[in-house]
Amino acid sequence: MLADEILELLQTKISANEFDCYIKQLKFNEKASNEDFIVFNATSELMAKFIKTRYAEKIAYLYEVKTGKKPEVEITSQTKLKNIKQNQVNVKQIKAQSSILNPGYTFENFVCGDSNQFAFLNAKAVADKPGVLYNPLFIYGTTGLGKTHLLQSVGNYCLDQGKVVICVTSDQFMIDFTTHLNSHSMTKFREKYRNCDVLLIDDVQFLGKTDKIQEEFFNTFNELIAKKGQIVMTSDRPAKILKGFDERLKSRFEQSIMADITPPELDTKIAIIIKKCEFDKIYLNKEVIDYIATNMGDNIREIEGAIINLNAYASLMRVEITLEFAKNTLKDLIKEKHENINLETIIEIVSKELNIKPSDIKSKSRVQNIVEARRIIIYLAKMLTTNSMPQIANYFGMKDHSAVSHNIKKINELMESNEIFNLRVTEIKNKILTKG
């Protein structure tokens, strides 16, 4: 059976202990599965949640390697199996209609901070008055910062107000388009997407693949806006640097309200962890919360995954989650920091590579090439050293860590929009790592 082959393949990619503790117990649920939706049963709800967080994506990838098609993978417990059978809709039908809105994504449980406040306020305003304010809305930022949460919060809020909501990823939109085109039923496709009150498109950057799909989306976009239908899109980059898009469609995107989400500051990460713990009824002491916030990087999904891992391990081993336990459990997940690399090393190498005096870096000079070099150093310091953002701010005599966030954001934007600059920064980073 293919499912057995997949688990055997997974066994070669993880430790024997991991396989015996978690994967060996999984039972393939043939009745609840199809080629697009794969279900495995675990021995308990807690175990199912942990395995899904840690291994579902790996299992889906192995299916793709074997079959050329990536399914959705669900790990469930026997107690929840009934609900899956009652609620499961064939994934082909889901992809041909809209993604199911996750009721857990609401404005109430979204943690707002300096890094996402503008996007949050715009999304809330759009939900309050769809088609009236800020239409269309374009939310952008790197992976794992909360774009999908905000998008679906708009959808759930509008759904509660009795609005017709279509929420799809760009991949689902493309599959839906192709299905209707091949079955000569484009009228139904257009009725669906052009007669809704709110259209939500997640990861719109992937629409830049096919001219026909772009043409269809362009016409859908125009008709919805003309009818005062609300459009909200998310992307991993600003509209102006999207690749592969027709200029007319790109121009429409650029006319949107642009709301970016940047990596969360420390206070926001702490608030996110506290909120997650409250929601899942998990107790973490302040030491552990601070440790996760400081060391887990900026990806909110990874932070939430770390909390689930901690709770699962602690429950299985029946121990309290102490700082030492957290450090030991999360050591493989914690983003590697290069303790032998410090700010002085980075300044020395960046100054040499960019032909700037090290003394100019810490000066108040606003000369463009010095400002850019300073920003690169701040960006690399956050990435490669153990220094916190407040420590970096203090080193450069900045008012607070928000100035550090601003400089990092500027470098990220440049790296996304300028391939030569991106390569230059990467080269410098590699030289620092080699020396460190």
UniProtKB/Swiss-Prot annotation:
Major subcellular location class: cytoplasm
Keywords assigned by UniProt, alphabetized: ATP-binding, Cytoplasm, DNA replication, DNA-binding, Lipid-binding, Nucleotide-binding
Positions of region (Domain IV, binds dsDNA): 315-436
Classification via InterPro entries: AAA+_ATPase, Chromosome_initiator_DnaA, Chromosome_initiator_DnaA-like, Chromosome_initiator_DnaA_CS, DnaA_C, DnaA_dom, DnaA_N_dom, DnaA_N_sf
Subcellular location: Cytoplasm
A Gene Ontology cellular-component term: plasma membrane
Cytoplasm is among the record's keywords: yes
GO molecular function annotations of the record: ATP binding; ATP hydrolysis activity; DNA replication origin binding; lipid binding
This protein's record includes keyword tRNA processing: no
Entry coiled-coil feature ranges: none
Sequence positions that bind ATP: 144, 146-148
Disulfide pattern: none
Stretches the record annotates as Domain II: 69-99
GO BP terms, alphabetized: DNA replication initiation; regulation of DNA replication
SUPFAM superfamilies, per database record: P-loop containing nucleoside triphosphate hydrolases (SSF52540), TrpR-like (SSF48295)
Region of interest (Domain III, AAA+ region), residue spans: 100-314
Record region (Domain I, interacts with DnaA modulators): 1-69
NCBIfam families: DnaA
Family membership noted in the UniProt record: Belongs to the DnaA family.
Record's comment describing the protein's domains: Domain I is involved in oligomerization and binding regulators, domain II is flexibile and of varying length in different bacteria, domain III forms the AAA+ region, while domain IV binds dsDNA.
Subunit annotation: Oligomerizes as a right-handed, spiral filament on DNA at oriC.
UniProt function note: Plays an essential role in the initiation and regulation of chromosomal replication. ATP-DnaA binds to the origin of replication (oriC) to initiate formation of the DNA replication initiation complex once per cell cycle. Binds the DnaA box (a 9 base pair repeat at the origin) and separates the double-stranded (ds)DNA. Forms a right-handed helical filament on oriC DNA; dsDNA binds to the exterior of the filament while single-stranded (ss)DNA is stabiized in the filament's interior.
Protein's recorded name: Chromosomal replication initiator protein DnaA
Biological source species: Campylobacter concisus (strain 13826)
Gene from which the chain derives: dnaA
